[in-house]
Amino acid sequence: MRLFIAALIPDAVRDALHQAREQLQRAAPDRALRWVAPENYHITLLFLGEQDEARLPAIVQAMEAARAGVPPFTVAVQGLGVFPNWNRPNVLWAGVSEGGRLLGQMAAALERTLLPAPSGKPFHPHITLARLKTPCRDADGLKKRLYDATERFALASFGRYELRSISLMQSTLTPDGSVYTKLHAVAL
């Protein structure tokens, strides 16, 4: 089973992000951008990859430990950007301007408990909107169009919501893209 742990987002935030995505697609139409389906928008706390089903109870136990002492809290989704940078954009994302510290706290606890060798990379809470296929034709032109299109959303607010749970998700890869299924939720 291909698994990850996520903070899911409400429909209002999803709809605001989808409206921005539609504007971006018109401004930077390019087959080199692989857009994430709006129903798959989420904030990844930890990607676990392929896991044996027998490990599910330990994963849920780690989720419960990671959220211990964390009450429901506000998450604000604001601005667009790219990873790793505008010279080599691979991922187009919407950022988290509020709630990132608590998301990071839970992500770090999950990583310490569930990964044999924690990555040591800093946690950057975000919602992936698109991935850039590499290599792509006219990469410089695409970067310019994408930069120009996202600049107007640099500080845009896509909504705030109260995060009340974290979810264990299964990702099934299909020719039409990933299909996500919620396996378990742990309340904050």
Question: Where are these predicted regions, by residue range?
Answer:
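Histidine-dependent nucleotide/RNA phosphoesterase domain, centered on the 2H-phosphoesterase fold
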Residues: M1-L188
